[in-house]
Amino acid sequence: MHQNTNVDPQEIAKFERMAETWWDLNGEFKPLHLLNPLRLNYIDQTAGGIFGKKVLDVGCGGGILSESMARIGAEVDGLDMGDEPLEVARLHALETGVSINYVKNTAETHSQDHQAYYDVVTCMEMLEHVPDPQSVIKACCDMVKPGGFVFFSTINRNIKSYVHTILGAEYLLKMLPVGTHEHKKFIKPSELIELVDNTDLICTDALGISYNPLTGIFKYTPKVDVNYMIATRKVD
């Protein structure tokens, strides 16, 4: 798929509509705020610390992960195709005094002049929102330095993930707006690893994240049957 066509306008519009609530801790993005400390810790620990490292956050949205990485000393570029989320991200960074370079671009186009440029690349909850995940994964691989880390997170595709993520989170618990996810776009871990294997990345770890609706707490789990992250490293 051509680099400029790997964007779903409906997906962009979906997050444009929700942009103004991005930093509302009790709003539509509350799950991302609750989940973010686990993601940040996993990235920082697995990459051997990101302080002083060049990091790219692909599909950064309103900047929740980008800001948290910048706060612990990473030099962060945030990449997204949504005008409203990027505007929210820039404003919030300005208000909080965090230095982040936000760019409107696709991963594929950004990679053209950022070959082997970053120490760490993150692509969280983004692959299930693009027409061609393989194209994004290849671009992420191209942009990370040899020996550098690329992190992906997405949602497994099975009955349990449909019940938890769509019926539960969207319809019953109202944690997310109805229509945030499409089950057919979810990606099985085996499929994601196969896509990774088509590049110079090697999967080094996989970790699940579970949510307890009674306590409102996310935690790590070895089970990758719903939400999961993988760590990959580029071959030297």
UniProtKB/Swiss-Prot annotation:
Picking any one GO molecular function of the record gives:
3-demethylubiquinol 3-O-methyltransferase activity
Q: Which transformation does this protein catalyse, written as a reaction?
A: a 3-demethylubiquinol + S-adenosyl-L-methionine = a ubiquinol + S-adenosyl-L-homocysteine + H(+); a 3-(all-trans-polyprenyl)benzene-1,2-diol + S-adenosyl-L-methionine = a 2-methoxy-6-(all-trans-polyprenyl)phenol + S-adenosyl-L-homocysteine + H(+)
Task: From the UniProt record, give the pathway where this protein acts.
Answer: Cofactor biosynthesis; ubiquinone biosynthesis
One short Pfam name that applies is Methyltransf_23
GO terms under biological process: methylation
Q: Which domain of life is it from?
A: Bacteria
Keywords for this protein: Methyltransferase, S-adenosyl-L-methionine, Transferase, Ubiquinone biosynthesis
Q: What is its EC number?
A: 2.1.1.222, 2.1.1.64
Q: Where does S-adenosyl-L-methionine bind?
A: 39, 59, 80, 124
Class of this enzyme: transferase
Question: What Gene3D superfamilies does the entry give?
Answer: Vaccinia Virus protein VP39 (3.40.50.150)
Record's InterPro entries? SAM-dependent_MTases_sf, UbiG_MeTrfase
NCBIfam families in UniProt: UbiG
**What is stated as this protein's family in its record?**
Belongs to the methyltransferase superfamily. UbiG/COQ3 family.
Q: What does the UniProt record say this protein does?
A: O-methyltransferase that catalyzes the 2 O-methylation steps in the ubiquinone biosynthetic pathway.
What protein is this chain from? Ubiquinone biosynthesis O-methyltransferase
Species of origin reads Shewanella baltica (strain OS155 / ATCC BAA-1091)
